[in-house]
Amino acid sequence: MSRTILFQGDSITDCGRARIEITDPAYLRSGLGLGYPYLIAARLLCDRGEDFNFYNFGISGNRVVDLYARWKADCINLRPDILSILIGVNDTWHEKARQNGVEVPRYEQFYRMLLDWTLKELPEIKLVLLEPFVFPFSAVGGDWIEESDQRREVVAGIAKDYGAVFVPLQSILNNALKVAPQEHWLADGVHPMPAGHQLIADAWIKAAAPLLN
């Protein structure tokens, strides 16, 4: 029986996905976007055949509170077996740009509320939590860094508390700077370039491997 993997998040996850129904025959080709969810699906479908279904419900611009507002329709009702979440950069960005962000304590509160709700409704679900990441150039100001570090600490702590797989993307990206400069991995300090998406996909598959057997 096929298992369902659901990707949730913001524009990094969305990555231009077509807004079509998951029952549409074109969903797998167009509905996963052009980023790391598509790359993960491609790798697993190549290696594992039809063991998995893949859904991408990332929405550009989302903060953690936006996830919460749409969670029943876009997560609970889909009843995924594996849930992957990458959220947090807009919680900072929206505050810096227009004072409509989500401060770190409330970010943690809503993140935990999401997972509590999910586990109550889907107690057998497996969780993969990706830490938010930035590089300090272009769209990312120096005043982002401390807050971004705090959000990463929050996600790491939540992953530990909930027994989730944790994917430490910031350290992975930092290590990648030994290979190529930051612009090779992220276009504007936030959004991944093709190599950045591949890096995320590879890290996800490696970290989540115990859940895929």
Language model features with spans:
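Alpha-helical cap/lid subdomain in secreted, periplasmic
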Residues: 39-53, 66-213
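Functional beta-strand-loop-alpha-helix junction segments that form "active/interaction loops"
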Residues: 59-64
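Serine-esterase "nucleophile elbow" of acetyl-processing enzymes
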Residues: 1-57, 72-79
